[in-house]
Amino acid sequence: MMENLLIPPPPWVGRVDGTSSHHLRWHQAVTPLHDGAEPGACVLIGFSSDEGVERNKGRRGAARGPDALRGALSSMALAEPLRVYDAGTVAVTDNRLEAGQMALGSVVAATLDAGQFPVVLGGGHEVAYGTYLGLAQAAVRTPKRRIGILNLDAHFDLRSDPVPSSGTPFRQILEQEHASGTALQYSVLGISQPSNTTALFDTARGYDVRYLLDDDCSVSDRHRVAVFVSEFLSDVDLVYLTIDLDVLPAAVAPGVSAPAAYGVPAETIQFVCDAVAASGKLAVCDVAELNPSFDIDNRTARTAARLIHRIVTKRIPIAV
């Protein structure tokens, strides 16, 4: 029997300029998820964990990420009314990461099966395996639909560690897909060469991972980035978009476990998110590695919230 690790959502509060549709902000649109929530709505799911980060020898603090993201989203203005629910937060306690990932997968799958759009608020990048489990279990995934994972990240996260961590999720996913005899395309945009060993590049080649280095993702490289994303989208039917905030420059995203010495400009990341949201293929999204303990002026949380805002408000639903 699946253990229930879901805790209720916190209250959403923020600035109030009025109650008409012309004054709406996120906190006025979000309500707790209930059984009658309509298909097509966005459902926020928190994943409070930094167990995977610690196992990967990183800095603790990402467990506070979900509520920091909620806080940054709260007062963002909505151009038009939004259907959005908060399912609460899957909390990883007592080092029980694997149980938390399974619980998250169950919530994501239920959300997808209800015809809704899950957006998972991490948490370390160990969130990815839980998000994937949900998509893999959901009815929306059929044998004829190929899953594509687009990871915006400075790291491959393909480590072969003895226990699951924030550095292993995509290797776990690829191994599970291989064992099941199913096809999955894993692509990464923003890879930092100095942050990934030759062994990790070799592993990526072995799994036929497509990637674009951070050196090739500047604002002047827009065409190269557009081609990379377009080719990815053309080869898949369902997209899981995962954003590790350490893909951004440290000046923009200081509040992560491993701040980037170089990073991909926010303009490029926003462009990619917009393209994926408008593709009509985006099934699920998560945001990982926000560490409020190291954030400065909430820069990282605000940047992440802007990306979430654009993804949710610009997303074209998947055709049934």
Swiss-Prot record:
UniProt-annotated binding residues for Mn(2+) 1: 125, 153, 157, 244
MF terms in GO: agmatinase activity; formimidoylglutamase activity; manganese ion binding
Keyword Metal-binding: yes
EC number(s) per entry: 3.5.3.8
Binding positions for Mn(2+) 2 per the UniProt entry: 153, 155, 244, 246
Pathways per UniProt: Amino-acid degradation; L-histidine degradation into L-glutamate; L-glutamate from N-formimidoyl-L-glutamate (hydrolase route): step 1/1
Enzyme class: hydrolase
Annotated catalysed reactions: N-formimidoyl-L-glutamate + H2O = formamide + L-glutamate
Cofactor requirements of the protein: Mn(2+)
GO BP terms in the entry: L-histidine catabolic process to glutamate and formamide; L-histidine catabolic process to glutamate and formate; putrescine biosynthetic process from arginine, via agmatine
Hydrolase recorded as keyword: yes
Cofactor note: Binds 2 manganese ions per subunit.
Keyword vocabulary terms for this entry: Histidine metabolism, Hydrolase, Manganese, Metal-binding
Membrane-crossing residue ranges in chain numbering: none
Function as written in the Swiss-Prot or TrEMBL entry: Catalyzes the conversion of N-formimidoyl-L-glutamate to L-glutamate and formamide.
Family the UniProt entry places it in: Belongs to the arginase family.
Name assigned to this protein: Formimidoylglutamase
Encoding gene (name): hutG
